[in-house]
Amino acid sequence: MLNSFDAAYHSLCEEVLEIGNTRNDRTNTGTISKFGHQLRFDLSKGFPLLTTKKVSFKLVATELLWFIKGDTNIQYLLKYNNNIWNEWAFENYIKSDEYKGPDMTDFGHRALSDPEFNEQYKEQMKQFKQRILEDDTFAKQFGDLGNVYGKQWRDWVDKDGNHFDQLKTVIEQIKHNPDSRRHIVSAWNPTEIDTMALPPCHTMFQFYVQDGKLSCQLYQRSADIFLGVPFNIASYALLTHLIAKECGLEVGEFVHTFGDAHIYSNHIDAIQTQLARESFNPPTLKINSDKSIFDINYEDLEIVDYESHPAIKAPIAV
């Protein structure tokens, strides 16, 4: 048996495996892909942290709070041992004149096929992370990912140089004009795509208030179904909870709309392992603070009664 959250995710995986198109991609890994899909999660029935594999709530929450703070430097994430964005910062570093170590070209693929190189890569990454944590000057230069999510959410800059806080504006709109159809935040800024380590995959989200409940719909242009989507589901569910609390509302639905939803060819075995599992009851979320959403910390959040199958490792495509 599957709970409704795991069932929705499993249905996406099964459909892409069954009818998806075989495609090449930017990372040269290869994918099975479907264009256009939608999942719906009733947040009143629990918190959608998948149970057919362990998903780290700490990683989900600290990344989301990093976005909310408007931060774009991995130093904050590394303080919480969150390594989600390391590869993109590391890639910028090894291309710089500052880097003097062994050749790390195409480290993502080489580390998977060459054990000796993988040991070199792990050592260079370890040194890189340590310098980010201990050397603020180095972190400022090589830990920053450019104008990624947090910058666009909190400090969008228009053609005239005016700064606009999308997230704060949307929260005020929800409080004072809940029926508006303009409760939208966009991370896709076409004029700044080239300044980002990775263009935004989860591109735009919109809020909807009905009967005292806040719902959120995300449009995700590009979705790594195995590694990314479980995090994205939990992240935007958490965002919905935080903004609902900020606005004095209950939670409604999280609606997840996909553009290119894909399974990487080297994730197929891992997905099939997950699909063979049954699920546990979903956990619940507790927010143990009355702080503003802009001041809340990871320590203020708690996942209650989370039981899951073990995590399943798979390589990330950079």
Swiss-Prot record:
Please tell me one Gene Ontology term that the record gives under cellular component.
cytosol
* A GO MF term: thymidylate synthase activity
Q: What is the name listed in the Swiss-Prot or TrEMBL entry for this protein?
A: Thymidylate synthase
Q: What is its EC number?
A: 2.1.1.45
Q: Where is the active site?
A: 201
Disulfide feature? none
What are the record keywords, sorted? Cytoplasm, Methyltransferase, Nucleotide biosynthesis, Transferase
Q: Subunit structure of this entry?
A: Homodimer.
Task: List residues binding (6R)-5,10-methylene-5,6,7,8-tetrahydrofolate.
Answer: 224, 317
Q: Quote the pathway field.
A: Pyrimidine metabolism; dTTP biosynthesis
Q: PANTHER family per the record? A: THYMIDYLATE SYNTHASE, THYMIDYLATE SYNTHASE 1
Give one Pfam hit by family name.
Thymidylat_synt
Q: Which family does it belong to?
A: Belongs to the thymidylate synthase family. Bacterial-type ThyA subfamily.
Report the locations given in the UniProt record. Cytoplasm
Q: Which SUPFAM superfamilies does the annotation name?
A: Thymidylate synthase/dCMP hydroxymethylase
Q: From the UniProt record, report the name of the gene that encodes this protein.
A: thyA
